[in-house]
Amino acid sequence: MATELLCLHRPISLTHKLFRNPLPKVIQATPLTLKLRCSVSTENVSFTETETEARRSANYEPNSWDYDFLLSSDTDESIEVYKDKAKKLEAEVRREINNEKAEFLTLLELIDNVQRLGLGYRFESDIRRALDRFVSSGGFDGVTKTSLHATALSFRLLRQHGFEVSQEAFSGFKDQNGNFLENLKEDTKAILSLYEASFLALEGENILDEARVFAISHLKELSEEKIGKELAEQVNHALELPLHRRTQRLEAVWSIEAYRKKEDANQVLLELAILDYNMIQSVYQRDLRETSRWWRRVGLATKLHFAKDRLIESFYWAVGVAFEPQYSDCRNSVAKMFSFVTIIDDIYDVYGTLDELELFTDAVERWDVNAINDLPDYMKLCFLALYNTINEIAYDNLKDKGENILPYLTKAWADLCNAFLQEAKWLYNKSTPTFDDYFGNAWKSSSGPLQLIFAYFAVVQNIKKEEIENLQKYHDIISRPSHIFRLCNDLASASAEIARGETANSVSCYMRTKGISEELATESVMNLIDETCKKMNKEKLGGSLFAKPFVETAINLARQSHCTYHNGDAHTSPDELTRKRVLSVITEPILPFER
């Protein structure tokens, strides 16, 4: 098969809609000219399959998005107007946060609202100073003697920002038998705050474990008739998934709509939140145009018909991992890698023969373009696309930061492909590994380590040797979010994978290893998720080896895992709810603020 050593730039038609089903047009799209450097083009490559060789099919749902429609951000002039307005509103909110005369509870609730509305990144230093002031003046000791709501709220905010506070703060709300006081149930707002705080627990913090059980049992008993519609919506939202496990953009859009219904809403804060949400959304649209052009040029979605095309879902995932506007490079890098992972996973899981998979794994390990001579045609296409993309990412990093990261990127891919290969061997041998053997491989095959290594080089400006060495060893900040990724994925996909004949899954392996029912195995996996979350919470306390932006990115990957797999596998089989979420985050602006 011949390959062209050309760089092709083909314009994209913007006459269709992003979603193939009719949807309201939100923003007028405008064309964008983008040049991309590449060494090998895969766009005009074709291949033929061996007709006599049987290939499995997973019958995946087809892609439901139309890449011909790429939304644009507003004009530069409009963005500048928005920036000026946002700057003025931001100054007003900053004054409120820095008001040393404000009552502590008022300040804490303001900080909580700022963060829920998606504005925390604008006020990081202000919030830290305010919390420092709160702690140094004895504020935390004071609120623990006043109300459960104030105690739980301050506890959660302080732990979120790396302060070491003791679970003993809640001991004062227990009776002589060690049970939480029954009269606390009369204050739903306080119970809701206690529930949210309990998810910041560390290993061995039994008081917080008891607090969660106590809060959940009461919150589930409440009805809208008893507490009112507004509070009932908050309770249901929290019980579905706690705040600490939600992605920030989805939480922001939900919180904005909930907050604007409040009679006592801070109108300046609300206006800034809506403006900020729409401004960041315009950045996502710009990023998506760039990534979509790359995907069309790569051409894998149209050439490899057996595999899932999930670029939009991969980009949406990347927004959850790094939502801040300054992290476009991270979003694009993670989206590209997850798109590749999705297709290559299908090659290993469904389409490739074991001999072919071993050849592909060897090619990735060697990272030599000449290795394509040993590959079947469809793998040549995939390997060249991967080879070009990763080399380009490494080149850009060398040019911009002076660091050759290619060995780290290629090792991450080699490790992933070896993990995929091990799973393929289990499948071909029709063997079910023990849970320990399975999981020791599966957290790597989740692609979590790979995504986080690519994310590290995108969000960290000053790359440190010690950090890189620990990345290579898959430090806890890499492994633990990946554990959560794998466990959440397995909970959501177990039934479908069993139907496809795949023998390795956390649930099925746990059933076989422990000799228990599917129900008990599922419960055990959920407990493993909880315990891993507690271990990961410690990364924010006592100072991490890694820079804060990367720590947040790693935690966000775990959050995105919770959200993506909470009600099924929203990446493999995106449903209507998933599509609505994608549209709300990427394309549909929030209606303007009106006084």
From Swiss-Prot:
<dbReference type="InterPro" id="IPR050148">
    <property type="entry name" value="Terpene_synthase-like"/>
</dbReference>
<dbReference type="GO" id="GO:0016102">
    <property type="term" value="P:diterpenoid biosynthetic process"/>
</dbReference>
<keyword id="KW-0479">Metal-binding</keyword>
<comment type="subunit">
    <text>Homodimer.</text>
</comment>
<feature type="binding site">
    <location>
        <position position="349"/>
    </location>
    <ligand>
        <name>Mg(2+) 2</name>
    </ligand>
</feature>
<comment type="similarity">
    <text>Belongs to the terpene synthase family. Tpsb subfamily.</text>
</comment>
<dbReference type="InterPro" id="IPR001906">
    <property type="entry name" value="Terpene_synth_N"/>
</dbReference>
<dbReference type="GO" id="GO:0009507">
    <property type="term" value="C:chloroplast"/>
</dbReference>
<feature type="binding site">
    <location>
        <position position="497"/>
    </location>
    <ligand>
        <name>Mg(2+) 3</name>
    </ligand>
</feature>
<dbReference type="InterPro" id="IPR036965">
    <property type="entry name" value="Terpene_synth_N_sf"/>
</dbReference>
<feature type="binding site">
    <location>
        <position position="345"/>
    </location>
    <ligand>
        <name>dimethylallyl diphosphate</name>
    </ligand>
</feature>
<keyword id="KW-0934">Plastid</keyword>
<comment type="function">
    <text>Lyase that catalyzes the formation of isoprene from dimethylallyl diphosphate via a syn-periplanar elimination mechanism in which the diphosphate-leaving group serves as a general base.</text>
</comment>
<dbReference type="InterPro" id="IPR008949">
    <property type="entry name" value="Isoprenoid_synthase_dom_sf"/>
</dbReference>
<keyword id="KW-0150">Chloroplast</keyword>
<dbReference type="InterPro" id="IPR005630">
    <property type="entry name" value="Terpene_synthase_metal-bd"/>
</dbReference>
<feature type="binding site">
    <location>
        <position position="493"/>
    </location>
    <ligand>
        <name>Mg(2+) 3</name>
    </ligand>
</feature>
<protein>
    <recommendedName>
        <fullName>Isoprene synthase, chloroplastic</fullName>
        <ecNumber>4.2.3.27</ecNumber>
    </recommendedName>
</protein>
<dbReference type="GO" id="GO:0000287">
    <property type="term" value="F:magnesium ion binding"/>
</dbReference>
<dbReference type="Pfam" id="PF01397">
    <property type="entry name" value="Terpene_synth"/>
</dbReference>
<keyword id="KW-0460">Magnesium</keyword>
<feature type="binding site">
    <location>
        <position position="349"/>
    </location>
    <ligand>
        <name>Mg(2+) 1</name>
    </ligand>
</feature>
<feature type="binding site">
    <location>
        <position position="489"/>
    </location>
    <ligand>
        <name>dimethylallyl diphosphate</name>
    </ligand>
</feature>
<dbReference type="Pfam" id="PF03936">
    <property type="entry name" value="Terpene_synth_C"/>
</dbReference>
<dbReference type="InterPro" id="IPR008930">
    <property type="entry name" value="Terpenoid_cyclase/PrenylTrfase"/>
</dbReference>
<dbReference type="GO" id="GO:0034009">
    <property type="term" value="F:isoprene synthase activity"/>
</dbReference>
<dbReference type="InterPro" id="IPR044814">
    <property type="entry name" value="Terpene_cyclase_plant_C1"/>
</dbReference>
<dbReference type="GO" id="GO:0120251">
    <property type="term" value="P:hydrocarbon biosynthetic process"/>
</dbReference>
<feature type="binding site">
    <location>
        <position position="345"/>
    </location>
    <ligand>
        <name>Mg(2+) 1</name>
    </ligand>
</feature>
<comment type="pathway">
    <text>Secondary metabolite biosynthesis; terpenoid biosynthesis.</text>
</comment>
<feature type="binding site">
    <location>
        <position position="345"/>
    </location>
    <ligand>
        <name>Mg(2+) 2</name>
    </ligand>
</feature>
<keyword id="KW-0809">Transit peptide</keyword>
<feature type="binding site">
    <location>
        <position position="423"/>
    </location>
    <ligand>
        <name>dimethylallyl diphosphate</name>
    </ligand>
</feature>
<feature type="transit peptide" description="Chloroplast">
    <location>
        <begin position="1"/>
        <end position="37"/>
    </location>
</feature>
<feature type="binding site">
    <location>
        <position position="489"/>
    </location>
    <ligand>
        <name>Mg(2+) 3</name>
    </ligand>
</feature>
<feature type="binding site">
    <location>
        <position position="486"/>
    </location>
    <ligand>
        <name>dimethylallyl diphosphate</name>
    </ligand>
</feature>
<dbReference type="InterPro" id="IPR034741">
    <property type="entry name" value="Terpene_cyclase-like_1_C"/>
</dbReference>
<feature type="short sequence motif" description="DDXXD motif">
    <location>
        <begin position="345"/>
        <end position="349"/>
    </location>
</feature>
<keyword id="KW-0456">Lyase</keyword>
